[in-house]
UniProtKB/Swiss-Prot annotation:
Catalytic residue positions: E393
Annotated binding of Zn(2+), by residue: H392, H396, H402
Domain TSP type-1 per the UniProt entry, residue ranges: 547-602, 825-883, 884-945, 947-1001, 1003-1058
A Pfam match: TSP_1
GO cellular component: collagen-containing extracellular matrix; extracellular matrix; extracellular region; microfibril
Classification via PANTHER family: A DISINTEGRIN AND METALLOPROTEINASE WITH THROMBOSPONDIN MOTIFS 10 (PTHR13723:SF26), ADAMTS A DISINTEGRIN AND METALLOPROTEASE WITH THROMBOSPONDIN MOTIFS PROTEASE (PTHR13723)
Primary localization class, coarse: secreted
Gene3D superfamilies recorded: 2.60.120.830, 3.40.1620.60, Collagenase (Catalytic Domain), Thrombospondin type-1 (TSP1) repeat
Statement: the UniProt record of this protein carries the keyword Cytoplasm: no
Localization terms from the record: Secreted, Extracellular space, Extracellular matrix
Annotated protein name in UniProt: A disintegrin and metalloproteinase with thrombospondin motifs 10
Gene: ADAMTS10
Organism: Homo sapiens
Names of required cofactors: Zn(2+)
Amino acid sequence: MAPACQILRWALALGLGLMFEVTHAFRSQDEFLSSLESYEIAFPTRVDHNGALLAFSPPPPRRQRRGTGATAESRLFYKVASPSTHFLLNLTRSSRLLAGHVSVEYWTREGLAWQRAARPHCLYAGHLQGQASTSHVAISTCGGLHGLIVADEEEYLIEPLHGGPKGSRSPEESGPHVVYKRSSLRHPHLDTACGVRDEKPWKGRPWWLRTLKPPPARPLGNETERGQPGLKRSVSRERYVETLVVADKMMVAYHGRRDVEQYVLAIMNIVAKLFQDSSLGSTVNILVTRLILLTEDQPTLEITHHAGKSLDSFCKWQKSIVNHSGHGNAIPENGVANHDTAVLITRYDICIYKNKPCGTLGLAPVGGMCERERSCSVNEDIGLATAFTIAHEIGHTFGMNHDGVGNSCGARGQDPAKLMAAHITMKTNPFVWSSCSRDYITSFLDSGLGLCLNNRPPRQDFVYPTVAPGQAYDADEQCRFQHGVKSRQCKYGEVCSELWCLSKSNRCITNSIPAAEGTLCQTHTIDKGWCYKRVCVPFGSRPEGVDGAWGPWTPWGDCSRTCGGGVSSSSRHCDSPRPTIGGKYCLGERRRHRSCNTDDCPPGSQDFREVQCSEFDSIPFRGKFYKWKTYRGGGVKACSLTCLAEGFNFYTERAAAVVDGTPCRPDTVDICVSGECKHVGCDRVLGSDLREDKCRVCGGDGSACETIEGVFSPASPGAGYEDVVWIPKGSVHIFIQDLNLSLSHLALKGDQESLLLEGLPGTPQPHRLPLAGTTFQLRQGPDQVQSLEALGPINASLIVMVLARTELPALRYRFNAPIARDSLPPYSWHYAPWTKCSAQCAGGSQVQAVECRNQLDSSAVAPHYCSAHSKLPKRQRACNTEPCPPDWVVGNWSLCSRSCDAGVRSRSVVCQRRVSAAEEKALDDSACPQPRPPVLEACHGPTCPPEWAALDWSECTPSCGPGLRHRVVLCKSADHRATLPPAHCSPAAKPPATMRCNLRRCPPARWVAGEWGECSAQCGVGQRQRSVRCTSHTGQASHECTEALRPPTTQQCEAKCDSPTPGDGPEECKDVNKVAYCPLVLKFQFCSRAYFRQMCCKTCHGH
């Protein structure tokens, strides 16, 4: 099996001759183009968000850097059309590529010559319009368009055509460009493979190969790293790789000072986008903090065809310039000049083992990230595809091996080889990471090797506008943009995923481009919506890319040990939902641990580290078999498995991490978890605060032992060994100090074994000396005073003896001796194990109760046996504080809409995440992975009884004044289909059949006068009469008329007399005798009336 070599011999089919140049394989762009199987010419045009040409307005008169062709806008749209392709690029400025205040440095042989601020304005990343989730674009707009377009499972590369026509163009036109597929590239080194073989001897290999590490022992899934000291392990957090980029003098000469800066940044722009892909399983930001362009050779930097020697020289050189540039030119200490990794881009055709050109493209140490002299790489410039080389090599510094080398990726039926493939073929997808790469970087960060990536450097931020182009241009107008002025929309189905338009030949066609965002749409669940990211959503809403959310915790795994304190683990994955459309990867704890099987192992059990070392006895090491035992010398990591070959004078690290639950050191109860030393309480529980007292009793009160200390002065110097003190069995915290600067000889005598220390100054420091069931450590302080210390307890009594040369005090001693069992109280308080966490997530609690135990057998007894005054306080701690995964929260069902027969009831259904015990956060429905529970359901009650049914009311009778309305009331069945006898319905519930009414007031009664009768006089004045009666509005007789308004019933009349006969005199004028009211007639001036004038002729005469 080939080791996970860091040499990248990617197939040169990645794209030769991109950007401003052609590679060493071709002398000109014409020669390069002739090598392609096919290519096309396109004229990229800057357009608006819907593909329409921009209105041209002349720029203001100002000086502009020649040839950039760039814009300062944060968002751009370009249309790239060729005979077989049609792309509408949606580009957004890459704000995360450059750290704040980054500068470009030009170095001569003497060091830094001059520097200026970097110009990030022409670096863009994005996607094809309407295809945010299925396409990728990384483009530099300086000097034309240079970059990659990934769409429809094909990679396209674009670069300006050299020597194109230079006629006048509008600012939106970019001139002729070459567009070709990566699959059309051909190169003689296509089958070049990794040049490292198994049979090469380990000794003598270059240092970057000696550091190779095996793949993770088991798939780590979605585990992430531990953080800096004090931070939790297995917690996913954002990482920031501050990157130094160096272009050698051949790069500067080839591309020219005018263009090399933007060319290099265009490459790094693609690198940054590759590390942003969610397939990496971690959030890693590539930031350029320093860009150095070498215009001359450097005195201490040797770059040649030999990749190994060039890498060695570059790694040392980049370390030397961290705080200085050139010969002592200081870089301001603002944090920007520091870097986590260094990238060299060279125009040399490099080769791994010889100083001649060959197919090697890159070289980097595996697992070198955050190590100052190993976090570096050399990369051959092959055009824009250099970005894949750099991303590949940085992957190696994260501990990634090649896909298929020491792992299953790339094998048949397994995850295909991807960005970390040893060489790229036409079937390889270099834009995503394989599951093996994800496991490698997770293991690397999980082991605490990425601490330097936790700090967040300053960066340049930009505000991006948000638009809804479909609101400005409806679907018909979008069709006219694509197919001419007579086109219009012709299919109205899933317009958000595919816009269908009438062609010039009046056929309904589509180019598979979705309608613009904001275009009106409708589905069976949305009456009025608009298109957003190829989906019809409620009008006005803008659902962004879905951020990842943690799924549920897996069940606790098996315990790592059967006794002595093991570890059980549980993990969760960022898949509820998975991050999509650029959504963020989950941050937070992804693996948790708990203690298990904490009881002591049986007496005589083999040391757990010894067991692990002995498992390698049957595995050959460099072709031979050895018996391995634990090595605990200086410089050994506490949680790595370092074993000594018994009988041989060498040791080696057999495993990067011991089995979980292994003690970190012999004199501590702390244990190793995932390669990191974790604190445990003396009860062997992770995270427990329970501590030993001075007697080494867990949770004790110090009453089980007494401290014995003193200073010994010899009685007869030189007379032989003298007894100093007797240390009883079970003593702990033993301390013996030599006060005579080793002018004494010390001995420890036991029942079965002894320890003699002579010539202490010559003993290697520190030294570990096993005796009486414990380990004594020989230490030497800064004042040269030596001491012998042991944690204990000792399993046999010891006598301290000394052979002194002077009468001066020779030894100081101190230890804690056990008190006789008879004098110990028989019962004492102890902490019980922690209870199970009260909640699975969002913050639960655990309680550690206190119980009274028998000191002799540790059995629990009734509380009254222990002293109430010494009772320990009950403990409580938080647990499972991480937020719960999104889930549906369902309310109670409402009452049925009907109390009998069939009805409907409803309830509230909300997608939310419980953040803590007192806080819940409502989320969009798409965040919940499970189907939404129903909001409505049918409900049924008892059969409804018959009921009264009333028909409509009749009109009010009479039409004015008080009246009545009438209606028909029937007894009906519950479904109103059958009419039943009235006895079937409740009489008390019967609605009324009549109702009083009063539409309006009736007209008042009025006087009605008849016709006048004939005059009573046949000649002269007389009277006539008529009838006057009071009638209602119905014509009936009434007594309600106003008397004052009653019309008269008589009237004076005058009949015409015949002519008088001769001799007849005039008739005498007199009052009628029967009338006595003539004076009143005169008084009230009624004489003008004919009647009164006739009746009172005399009285009225003359008036």
